[in-house]
Amino acid sequence: MKLSFSLCIFFLISADIVQGTCKKVAQRSPNVNYDFCVKSLGADPKSHSADLQGLGVISANLAIQQGSKIQTFIGRILKSKVDPALKKYLNDCVGLYADAKSSVQEAIADFKSKDYASANVKMSAALDDSVTCEDGFKEKKGIASPVTKENKDYVQLTAISLAITKLLGA
């Protein structure tokens, strides 16, 4: 009986860190939806035992996964016959997401070494890369981004990490 009660308390406290963090993040960042944050962080089993620093690493890893999905999705589009202008913007996005991945990997190392100011700079760079990808499609009339929804999810994931760096004192 005592063990099951202790486990219930542990899971309630764990859920509270995700929900509490997401509440603070959503209040501070216009790029983050509370429900998206809770769903994203809560989907990782490690979030249930993580501290704030750990949630920063988890959200950064989720951003890497989302960036990889976007690159794969773009690769499939590029294998089909596409307008040359669209192809140019998609290729630009592939390069931008490669840069973003490097930035996020460095930010993860910074989180782990508690260099939150550096993690903040690198997560900002990754967020900027995804915005630049999306903005590229607006340069030519009649070209619509096929990755808008995916980019929005990526922006939220990087914004979560970015906001966590600020909560940690960056």
Curated annotation (Swiss-Prot):
Expressed in pollen (at protein level). Expressed in pollen. The keyword Ligase does not apply. Residues 1-14 form the signal peptide. Keywords: Allergen, Disulfide bond, Signal. InterPro entries: Invertase/methylesterase_inhib, Pectinesterase_inhib_dom, Pla_a_1-like. GO terms for molecular function: enzyme inhibitor activity. Induction: Expression of mRNA is induced by ground vehicle traffic-related air pollution. No significant difference in the level of protein expression between pollen samples collected from urban polluted versus unpolluted areas. NCBIfam families: PME_inhib. Belongs to the PMEI family. This is Putative invertase inhibitor. It comes from Platanus orientalis (Oriental plane-tree).
